[in-house]
Amino acid sequence: MKGAQRLCDKGRVLDSSGVVLAKNSVANGEIFLIDYKCEPKGARAIFECEEFAVFDKPSGVLSHPNGRHCKYSLYDEIWSLYGRSAAVVHRLDKETSGVILVAKNLASLNALKMLFENRAVKKSYFALVSGRVERDFVIDEPIGESLETDEVAIKMRICENGKKAITEIYPIEYFSEFNATLVRAVPLTGRQHQIRLHLFHVKHKILGDPLYGTDTATFEAILDEKLSVCERINLTGASRLCLHAANLHFEFNGKIYDINTKSDFKAEFLKSLGI
């Protein structure tokens, strides 16, 4: 019964009246179930063992399908490779690229999720940010949901009564020709949009960020893919969010795993600037 309700909640059950959403409702006439058909594009794991795999997700790919009209997500790959018991353990935003952990079965999924909940997984990212970052520093600012009614629902904000959030920032390389710095960001907590919001808060916005540093109309235009590449670059600094998940470090079943990206993220960042 729970499975049937989940299908209704996702809008995958239709009758002659349309999509069946209401709980305990009686469907009329013929019943249609929308099943999820995998259409893989050939992505392969950069690391795998019996319990899990790690993929290098490209920017622009959803970690998880977001509705009936989703044409492609990482699940097209993982379900075609490992079956429908496989699932992503944590999510990366659509425009964030990099390493993402995939459990091959429910037992592994629950165990790996517990590692994230207990902050036993160390993560590091690379980001291309505006301005010159000259020294290492730590951003310790609490994060909460935005209370502004005219703002995008997913937008977060720095607020005194928010959840504790700490990010370490390390400058790697400065590019004087476009006044931007490649930094390594290490989140010590796991808040939504933590790295993006923290860097925006200290005046080092991640280039290409469609949400922080833009207004609602611009964000929606980017989300709906209504802007040209040049327009996107002019408004946000890059044609994509220049944020890449580079490393996962954790212990699982008595073994220590240190998994690094294999993508040339620096070249991809620079290409997205349109230079």
Which residues does each predicted region cover?
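Short solvent-exposed strand/turn elements
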Residues: 188-191, 264-265
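RNA pseudouridine synthases
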Residues: 1-151, 163-164, 173-174, 264-274
